[in-house]
């Protein structure tokens, strides 16, 4: 709500026409009120679901009626996500039956999903409980993780009592395509490399071995395993550009590109970073169709408001925060650093932007993971440009195997040639990470930092960059005095 009001009131302030200023201010207040009311209602609904989950005492038998909205495989088991319309549990000799009617998300752990399809209504009995909480500091906290996604109850030992006949045809096609694509990736790229490709293309991280995940995390390149702005930009904007040249129409190519990206997001699970990138891409495409240039801060602000309205708990999710921190890093410190270091050299420009993103995301990385990969700036400079090659080649291999399964299945040479560039790049990634880990101070263990320290860092970073930019055109002595005062204030705040 604040983002929307800030944007529209800012536009109103810049408008020279008094009548337009009044209209924009009124519009901004109306939007603020509508968004605040919607957010409050969603927040109340989430609080009610959380209170319902708190009444669960360990594992309790219960029943659910609802609709399946996502099916995902995790190792040998399946995770079925349901929008429950009715939940009941308890009712033993000394227990009171608890009944809840209202839409809420429930996660079901199942061994077989052959009878289930996306969009299907079902009635089932199961053992209900809350997600497991962390016993030790630093341990994965499933309860907190799923609460950020609006899930407070999980079900096990499922017994399906009734299944509806209607289901989502599009959802089922996307589910089958995802499963088939995963099988192709495993058969072509092997188990180790295939797990990385599935994470990058399908959003499936369940198969990544612990060593690979730790190697990428310790070197600050684990973001390539999540479907984010890089992936959406590569796929969506490339598709938009190709279709625009083929059709000659901004409108037709925009509609087709947006449709493909939305379907791709649904197929891969609609992670927070994926949704953010999708919304920003849609705004960018609409802007180009209308002949206007998109603004990164406006697009990011709109995406954050939409996501927070749909799921208020997502603002506490680490992936959500890191995703928007990276965008804000490019928009704020990135633009300021470009003014400080004006250059036409693409390598230097990319290095400056990587530094800006690292400055923006670094405090959050330290806050959540208690360590900072020192050489991630330089590793990302080498690794990110090759992501597009992995994506295009992998999509090409999957498409070829889907279109010509009979021809390519028996032709091992063609499959090996198609997979070679991807396997080579992933081998280079691993080797670069291993070399970086041999350098001194490759990963700095910082321990826990407070929220106040992060806020002070961001304020100091932006303040220093603004003062440095002004130093190029203002009185240097005055700027130096301001910088000394700013540094003294930061040190005093940190000491307190």
Regions inferred by a protein language model and the residue ranges of each:
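Short acidic/histidine-centered micro-motifs embedded in hydrophobic/aromatic stretches
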Residues: 199, 203, 258, 424
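N-terminal leader/targeting segments
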Residues: 1-52, 276, 467-480
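Membrane-interface helix/helix-cap signal primarily in integral membrane proteins
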Residues: 33, 37-223
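Short amphipathic alpha-helical coupling elements at transmembrane boundaries
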Residues: 183, 214, 244, 261, ...
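Divalent metal-coordination and catalytic microenvironments
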Residues: 66, 126, 200, 228, ...
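Alpha-helical transmembrane segments of multi-pass integral membrane proteins
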Residues: 329-441
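Hydrophobic alpha-helical transmembrane segments in multi-pass membrane proteins
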Residues: 2-10, 210-377, 393, 449-496
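Non-globular, low-confidence helical/coil segments that flank catalytic cores
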Residues: 66, 88-92, 112-127, 138, ...
């Amino acid at each position: 709500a604040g983002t929307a009001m800030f944007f529209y009131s800012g536009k109103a302030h810049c408008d020279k026409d008094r009548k337009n200023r009044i209209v924009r201010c009124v519009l901004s207040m109306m939007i603020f009120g509508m968004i605040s009311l919607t957010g409050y209602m969603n927040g109340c609904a989430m609080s009610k679901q959380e209170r319902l989950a708190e009444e669960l005492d360990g594992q309790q038998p219960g029943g659910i009626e609802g609709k399946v909205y996502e099916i995902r495989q995790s190792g040998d088991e399946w995770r079925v996500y349901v929008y429950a319309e009715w939940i009941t549990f308890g009712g033993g000799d000394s227990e009171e039956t608890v009944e809840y009617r209202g839409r809420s998300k429930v996660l079901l752990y199942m061994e077989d999903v052959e009878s289930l399809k996306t969009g299907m209504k079902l009635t089932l009995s199961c053992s209900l409980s809350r997600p497991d909480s962390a016993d030790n500091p630093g341990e994965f906290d499933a309860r907190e993780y799923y609460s950020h996604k609006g899930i407070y109850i999980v079900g096990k030992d499922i017994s399906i009592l009734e299944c509806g006949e209607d289901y989502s045809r599009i959802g089922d096609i996307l589910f089958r395509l995802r499963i088939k694509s995963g099988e192709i990736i495993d058969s072509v790229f092997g188990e180790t490399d295939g797990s990385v490709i599935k994470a990058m293309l399908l959003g499936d991280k369940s198969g990544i071995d612990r060593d690979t995940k730790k190697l990428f995390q310790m070197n600050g390149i684990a973001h390539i395993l999540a479907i984010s702005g890089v992936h959406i930009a590569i796929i969506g904007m490339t598709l938009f550009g190709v279709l625009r040249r083929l059709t000659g129409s901004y409108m037709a190519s925009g509609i087709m590109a947006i449709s493909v990206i939305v379907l791709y997001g649904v197929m891969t699970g609609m992670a927070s970073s994926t949704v953010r990138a999708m919304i920003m891409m849609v705004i960018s495409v609409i802007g180009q169709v209308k002949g206007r240039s998109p603004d990164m801060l406006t697009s990011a602000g709109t995406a954050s408001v939409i996501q927070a309205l749909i799921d208020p708990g997502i603002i506490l999710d680490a992936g959500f925060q890191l995703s928007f921190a990276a965008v804000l890093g490019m928009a704020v410190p990135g633009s300021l650093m470009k003014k400080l270091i004006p250059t036409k050299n693409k390598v230097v420009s990319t290095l400056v932007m990587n530094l800006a993103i690292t400055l923006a995301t670094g405090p959050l990385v330290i806050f959540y993971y208690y360590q900072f990969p020192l050489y991630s700036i330089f590793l990302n400079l080498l690794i990110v440009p090759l992501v597009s090659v992995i994506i295009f080649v992998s999509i090409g291999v999957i498409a070829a195997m889907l279109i010509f399964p009979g021809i390519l299945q028996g032709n091992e040479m063609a499959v090996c040639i198609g997979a070679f560039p991807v396997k080579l790049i992933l081998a280079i990634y691993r080797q670069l990470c291993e070399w970086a880990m041999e350098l001194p101070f490759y990963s700095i263990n910082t321990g826990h930092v407070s929220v106040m320290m992060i806020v002070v860092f961001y304020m100091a970073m932006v303040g220093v960059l603004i003062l440095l930019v002004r130093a190029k055109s203002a009185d240097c002595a005055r700027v130096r005095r301001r910088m000394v005062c700013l540094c003294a204030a930061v040190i005093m705040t940190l000491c307190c």
